[in-house]
Amino acid sequence: MKKKLLGLLLAATMAVTCFAGCGGQGGDTAANTGDASAETEAEETVSNGGETVKIICGYGAGGTADLLARKYAETANKLQGDYNFVVENMTGGDGFAAATFFSEEDADTKDLLVFGYGLCYRHDLGKTYGTEEVDFDRTSMDPIGTVDDRTWIVYTTPDQTLESILDKAKNGGIKMSGGNPLSDCHLELGSLIALEGGNVMVVSGYEGGAEQKQGLVNGEVDVFVGTTQAAKDEVEAGTLIPILAISDKAFEGFVTPDGPIVVPTVAGDAKAPELSKDVDFSGCILPAGGTLATHAGADQAFRDDMTDIMKKVWADENYYGWIESVMLNNFQLYGDDAQAFMDDACEKALKAYDNLK
């Protein structure tokens, strides 16, 4: 029986935060998720004197996407002086408000978008199956290259285990935080739980990983699906525990109060023994993270400059060292290769959705 997807009423809030020497800009942004109110907060940071390029991040302050965009801007501004990168948070609809805004800008506008795979999954599902209203076309975004490759981790509280979570999912269902319904987090964990004969409900309205994690801390959800960076400190303190890596490779790197641990996976040699042995969960593993994108039709010279800068950023230890420190992955694709990878990922997401029917 096809699970019913409930319509969402999201309060879209736009928080504008300029990273490098740019005062905040207030205003209202209309998106498919509703009207967005603006709150401005500016950081005292010296501009490098270059032409301003905004990196529009559709996720909340303190989450991995936000921190990554800021590290990227910081690194790029130190490596060259032709462009001054600033970060603007435009929240609402787990990225939909920002994507809609970006798609309606003139193609010559020198903005970049944090363009994640999960956003594209929801876009394609909405366009194909009508799962939600989509007021933008993802072909209006043109990826420069990948900046974020992550392994989703399922976290819970120390009083729970993977076994207890699976049992609860099969007997009434569990609540999760981590994006909106049918985002990559939900498609991955949701399809896995469905294959196990259980149910997952996404508690939405959180903007970014920091708020989603707090939902678990506050007892509003049973599990939080987030990045390695998002709950690293809580794992070290013993207040949250990682119970499953949505990967086919054992995840190493977490340190608990009792020492280093290895997080089991959904497939492969390190598959968690609590999962059904006769079920192949490899289709639940989807690419996670994303790209920075220009407008489709943007000036080619500008795109070439952005590509050159991205390659320099990835080659700089300030960026790749930070990526390694928060246990994200150094994964680089550019231009057409990045677009092809994204399109292939969306095909996999449509197949994962079949498990939710």
Describe these PLM feature segments:
Residues 60-62, 117-118, 152, 156-161, ...:
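Short coil/turn segments
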Residues 110-113, 133-153, 175-177, 241-243, ...:
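A structural signal for short loop-to-beta-strand junctions that line the ligand-binding cleft
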Residues 38-140, 181, 196-234, 317, ...:
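N-terminal (or domain-start) structured segment
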Residues 50, 194, 236-237, 298-357:
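An extracytoplasmic/periplasmic, membrane-proximal ligand-sensing/linker region
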Residues 156-174:
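Flexible hinge/capping segments at coil-to-helix
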Residues 146-155, 175-195:
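Extracytoplasmic ligand-binding site segments that recognize negatively charged/polar headgroups
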Residues 1-54, 357:
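Short, low-complexity disordered leader/linker segments with a strong preference
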Residues 235-314:
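C-terminal lobe and pocket-closing loops
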